[in-house]
Design a protein with these regions (language model features):
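Conserved glycine-rich beta-strand-loop-beta hairpin in the small C-terminal domain of fold type I
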Residues: 149, 156, 171-181, 193-206, ...
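Conserved core segment of the aminotransferase class I/II
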Residues: 97-174, 182-183, 263-264
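Short, small-residue-biased leader/transition segments that mark boundaries at the very start
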Residues: 2-7
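PLP-dependent enzyme catalytic core of the Aspartate aminotransferase-like
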Residues: 100, 210, 219-228, 234-269
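A short helix->loop->beta-strand "cap" motif at the edges of active sites that frequently abuts
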Residues: 9, 69-72, 101-102
Length: 269
């Protein structure tokens, strides 16, 4: 939304459908939004944040075909791509088909996986030459095309020498998500964790507790010291959700889960 504000763009959202504890793409709604003659760009989150979906090749192909049909470019935000559960691999949007490749602008960065926020290590991959020139022109116009030397070396080191550490991290985060899901199920009535196979962020359904997650997050923060993200900032049905970061040592996680329980159990509904 920050980018749309800067460039005076109107955002047309195609909300995911929440079904049986997980999110799915509403392709009928997506096509309605894409066929709007004013729609020129689709921003895809792959894997999806905050829901943690790892989109399948078939789902991505269908998105690509629809976007191509209506002349829409797809920016695929793949910043969480390495952070999938063990045994789960994400599918790069541009790899799915020649159609997807032709209309794709893929954004990646070691920022999330290797904790490099602020180093300016983002990269953009644009296979199509004409589209690449447009992107090149835009990032130079905005003067964001010149990373510092430290950022370049840091990104190369992360992508070429970080595999062993990354595999350990993925296993650790997966364990933390399992611990979180079990703790909530056993100790916090009325709260459930959305099925997720990517990211270190848990999306908690608190719809049985409140329809104002901002108020609930503020209450928990004030009364327990636990900082959570209110779901309303993510649009859609976010008013019924909280986002919890579990990329931390297990001792910190357990402390946070106890605070979460105490905050929710004492919350005045």
């Amino acid at each position: 939304s920050a980018a749309s504000d800067v460039y005076k763009r109107q955002v047309l959202q195609s909300q995911l459908a929440y079904e049986n504890g997980r999110y799915v793409i509403d392709f009928e709604d997506l096509e309605v939004k894409l066929k709007n003659p004013q729609t020129t760009l689709l921003i895809l989150c792959n894997p999806q944040n905050p829901g943690g979906n790892v989109w399948s090749k078939e789902e991505l192909a269908r998105i690509g075909e629809l976007a191509y049909k209506y002349g829409v470019v797809v920016i695929s935000d793949e910043i969480h791509c390495e952070l999938t559960d063990p045994g789960i691999d994400y599918v790069p949007f541009a790899s799915v088909s020649e159609v997807c490749k032709k209309i794709s602008v893929t954004c990646i960065a070691p920022t999330k996986t290797f904790n490099m926020a602020g180093l300016q290590t983002a990269a953009i991959c644009v296979p199509d030459e004409r589209l690449r020139h447009k992107v090149w022109r835009a990032i130079n116009t905005d003067e964001v095309a010149e990373p510092n030397v430290f950022a370049v070396d840091a990104a190369i080191a992360a992508f070429t020498k970080g595999e062993e550490w990354l595999e350990q991290l993925r296993a650790y985060i997966y364990e933390n998500k399992q611990i979180t899901e079990k703790f909530i199920k056993d100790n916090i009535p009325g709260v459930s964790m959305v099925e997720s196979h990517a990211t270190y962020l848990c999306w908690l359904d608190v719809s049985d507790i409140t329809d104002n997650s901002t108020r609930l997050a503020a209450y928990i923060r004030k009364n327990t010291g636990l900082f959570l993200s209110a779901g309303e900032g993510f649009g859609g049905d976010g008013k019924h959700f909280l986002r919890l970061n579990v990329a931390c040592p297990k001792t910190t996680l357990m402390d946070g889960l106890e605070r979460l329980r105490n905050g929710i159990l004492s919350f005045d509904r």
